[in-house]
Amino acid sequence: MATIQIIIEEDNVTINVKKNQVPPIEVSPKIPPIEIENVKKNVLCPICLIAKVNTVLECTHVLCSNCVKKINVCPICRKTFQSINFFRL
């Protein structure tokens, strides 16, 4: 029976198996916290990819108000909607 030793360091995980050695596994770097300013600047409408999102549909998908005015079905999940919620970032 093989013995497994797991060594966890800050950003590396190494697994050693007695008799056989497994190469180190790279762990993804820690994801930095999301800053609200970055969200405001980078949230573009997934339909037109031009305008910032400012509308939430009943299905919780978000679009820009220009795209929402042209549709009555969510282009992402295909659910029909009756109400639209506008918001300001």
Swiss-Prot record:
Pfam family, one: zf-C3HC4_3
PROSITE patterns reported for this sequence: ZF_RING_1 (PS00518), ZF_RING_2 (PS50089)
Alphabetical UniProt keywords: Metal-binding, Zinc, Zinc-finger
Presence of the UniProt keyword Metal-binding in the record: yes
Signal peptide: none
Cross-referenced SUPFAM superfamilies: RING/U-box (SSF57850)
Molecular functions per Gene Ontology: zinc ion binding
Keyword Zinc-finger: yes
Residues in RING-type zinc fingers: 45-78
Protein name according to UniProt: Putative RING finger protein 121R
Record lineage: Viruses, Varidnaviria, Bamfordvirae, Nucleocytoviricota, Megaviricetes
